Amino acid sequence: EHYKYMQRAMWCMDAAIGEAARFSKAAIVSTDEFIKGPDCKTGIDAALNADDTINIMIIVDSKSDATTLLKWLQNVSYEHQMQLKHSDEFLDVKNQDGFYGIYAVFEVKSKDSKYGSLKIQVRISTPVLDCIAALEKCCESEEAKQLLEVYKKMA
């Protein structure tokens, strides 16, 4: 039962963040460790915290896109019974790099804590070049290192 729950949680987050990527010009990093601070200049930064909350930093290129994305995230969290916290917080980073950001925290609680925290992995989406910086931030992950090497060869 825990395995099914974990699979569902992973699928939900994968689908949610994958869809979110369509609103931005960036891609997604896959991680199973906390990334310090959602400070990616462009892209999506996702991290699973020790308390089974998931931090997602999404950068989009207009405030209207940010509003649309925010509504969509609220619907997704409701449908999949995930708690979306701090979802109304807009991070205006337009002065720095011309993008607007949303900081959202999803809470996915494990029903049986003896199995440890859930690991949420997110697929990398295109365009590739926009996510290289994000991948480099997460290079401690062996999977990220391998993907980065593949994409560098393709570029």
Across the structure, where does each feature detected by a protein language model lie?
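Long beta-strand-rich cores associated with HINT superfamily self-processing modules
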Residues: 41-155
